């Protein structure tokens, strides 16, 4: 009989928080009402914890679980990605009887169609979508779904510097203060831009669900404007001007995303967890900048108040 080395006692007997496999690629079909299913090429990461008395986990069981669950659940298109990761995590717990918790993550790229802002040119964009489930043998369960989108951000600090410098030059040319202000209001003032990446993850429960499409809209609201793969000249003008009239720090991105999240899901329970992240690739620096917030809906409501439809706080 072949030895099962994983069951041996380790030389250093300490428990491990997470052992598993990453980068497992599978094809997943997601159901759409009245339309053809969406085809996702998805990457799965799966983990269990390991007690101190065992040398290793049986990794082949992880691959077996994913294959079995996908074959069962994807025989026809699934309704949502959270059901899939929950099922995988649940099967992991059943297969690894020594584990006290199991985790399953799914990352996919969703291709979406949209039109450019002025000419209505057809184009596509890539949105990343996530599903994550952590299940405990004690019955605990945390399920998150999320998205990552790209956009353009325009720096308010540099814009104010350019605006102040322009005002001085106009004053030297003989323009009065009122006229200078009218000129600066009429012309989008230059600044440096970034390509931003907004990430939004929200907890889901049996009684609270969040559509991926709405999360995408909320995440996009964090930035100065959307980006497009194809732009005609009129479209390019519209994008650049709109972005420069809606400047955002990376910190602003997370805060506006939080406010839009509360507006989009006004009835979300206070204890629902959310994760918000904005990362901007700087154009005039050699580094990126990042802002994050991990909170509950209740904590955000206490800090922001109840935002009305115009986007202002109703405190």
Swiss-Prot record:
It is an enzyme of class 3 (hydrolase). GO terms for biological process: tetrahydromethanopterin biosynthetic process. The record marks 155 as: May be catalytically important. GO terms for molecular function: GTP cyclohydrolase I activity; GTP cyclohydrolase IV activity; iron ion binding. Transmembrane segments: none annotated. Its cofactor is Fe(2+). Pathway: Cofactor biosynthesis; 5,6,7,8-tetrahydromethanopterin biosynthesis. It catalyses: GTP + H2O = 7,8-dihydroneopterin 2',3'-cyclic phosphate + formate + diphosphate + H(+). Keywords: Hydrolase, Iron, Metal-binding. Binds 1 Fe(2+) ion per subunit. It comes from the Archaea. Its EC number is 3.5.4.39. The keyword Iron applies. Homodimer. Belongs to the GTP cyclohydrolase IV family. Converts GTP to 7,8-dihydro-D-neopterin 2',3'-cyclic phosphate, the first intermediate in the biosynthesis of coenzyme methanopterin. PANTHER family: GTP CYCLOHYDROLASE MPTA. This is GTP cyclohydrolase MptA. The gene is mptA.
